[in-house]
Amino acid sequence: MRLYFVLIFSVIFTTGNGKIQCKNMRGKSVDWFVVYKLPKLSGAGTSGKEFVYFDAESSDWTRGNDINDPNVAVGATVSQVYSADKSNNFWFMYSDDDPIKSADSYRGHAKGVSLFDSTTGFWLIHSVPNFPPIKSFSYPNTAEKYGQSFFCASMEVQHLTELAEHWKYIQATPYIINIPEKYATRFPTLKNVEAKQSLPRSATQFWISKPIKTVQGVTLMAYAKHKKFDGDIWNDLISRQNKVTLAVESWLNGSGDDIHTTCTSTSQTHDVTEMRVTGLNFASSKDHSKWAVSNSQTNPIVCFGDMNRQKSQLKRGGGALCIQNRNLWQLYHSFVIQVEPCKSSSHFSMFQTIATLLSAAGLVSKI
């Protein structure tokens, strides 16, 4: 009887931890996680490898010292691809700026990793250029300087239907892809993604939003825009669809013109200009991540995506994955110290940061 119990326990333990899913700080399966790689700040003593971690079971950030560690969170999750079974697993790495080729400025501005077996898998959205490598996990030295974002969701294999459609709309550029025949048969749109085939010329719908459930039943919303949408995914799609004011952190250091804070009668989307992350203050110019947080406690949305708020990206594909989680929302909302206000006097800036609330109360003149 004792031997029988040990064998049963061993099978359950091995199977539970052997699932292809997002991995936590201990390398164990988790429903979803967020990682914020901190920028290299000489005055604060950060090396550019430190990160903070939050998942479905967290109440606050957990600090990590080395984003390059293959055994925790991002590293443990991505490393599953390198040991995957080619005949039985689907995998996909995509990037507009991958480790193999020069940057692509025509197709979608999007970066991610996905891996599935016949039951479950994960989708990881990230902002890191030249990442991940094709043979084994490592984090590029060139991406240590700026802040970066990661959002991973574990999901059942049937959601490859929605993911394939999402990748087709955003024109995700594959640099590693493996589609066994059983996946190609069940999810034929994956072959369109592999062949870089996008929407037909007859298409009239240039954006989609789809609910996707994690393995634990959390509903996420995936938003995708094709380049012919010709608009800002944050303001023209996510803010308007959810009827919320957003603060968006994105890369605004490029050569293209910035869109700037957008305030209309139907939506407001503010560019973040200054942040405080776990006690570290830094300007948006130190950050390459792409995320948004709502200003609504009744609709506490946090989104992680592909797109910068620059005019050149209006005519490129890209997406975002959004989650409603009050603990995560409170953390991200508290990050925002300053946003660019509405320019027009006819629109009152609706995003209330810590700085604006304290200033309005007469407690501080400037933070």
Swiss-Prot record:
It comes from Caenorhabditis elegans. InterPro entries: DNase_II. Its EC number is 3.1.-.-. The keyword Membrane does not apply. Belongs to the DNase II family. GO terms for molecular function: deoxyribonuclease II activity. It comes from the Eukaryota. The keyword Signal applies. PANTHER family: CELL-DEATH-RELATED NUCLEASE 7 (PTHR10858:SF30), DEOXYRIBONUCLEASE II (PTHR10858). Glycans are attached at N253. GO terms for biological process: apoptotic DNA fragmentation; negative regulation of antimicrobial peptide production. Disulfide bonds: none annotated. Residues 1-18 form the signal peptide. This is Cell-death-related nuclease 7. Keywords: Glycoprotein, Hydrolase, Signal. It is an enzyme of class 3 (hydrolase).
